[in-house]
Design a protein with these regions (language model features):
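Short loop/beta submotifs within extracellular cysteine-rich repeat domains
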Residues: 65-66, 82
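Extracellular "spike/adhesin" assembly and maturation modules
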Residues: 1-63, 75, 79, 87-112
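Short glycine/proline-enriched turns and hinge-like loops at secondary-structure junctions
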Residues: 67-71
Length: 112
């Protein structure tokens, strides 16, 4: 059996697992970052100097700094650090900067 869900990479609890709260809290943290996706900006390449807790960005082709090596990812700032998720074709996101709804197609993010 896999140790996480297929689409959102939510961790499963293992039988007889110690400290189940850690795994459960990680799943809640991921859900909070991935569900009802509204991003500060799409195609972002430079992390903000002082991101707000919960800030989310769709990353562009050549991100720098803390985002280096995460091209095309979703960056989420939570609990004082960045974590990243790989969006799947069909995901929707609202871009706050342009007030546009986006859909991820095979060719990339595009306005709806």
């Amino acid at each position: 059996m896999a140790d996480q869900t297929v689409h959102l990479a939510l961790p499963y609890l293992a039988p007889s697992q110690a400290q189940k709260h850690v795994t459960y809290n990680e799943a809640l943290r991921r859900l909070d970052g991935l569900v009802q996706l509204a991003v500060e900006a799409a195609s972002a390449t430079t992390p903000p100097g002082a991101p707000a807790e919960g800030a989310r960005y769709l990353l562009g082709a050549s991100p720098t700094g803390a985002w280096a090596g995460q091209a095309g990812a979703l960056a989420v700032f939570a609990d004082g650090s960045w974590w990243f998720a790989t969006p799947e074709v069909g995901w929707l996101a609202y871009d706050k900067a342009t007030e546009t709804v986006l859909v991820l197609k095979a060719a990339g993010w595009t306005g709806v």
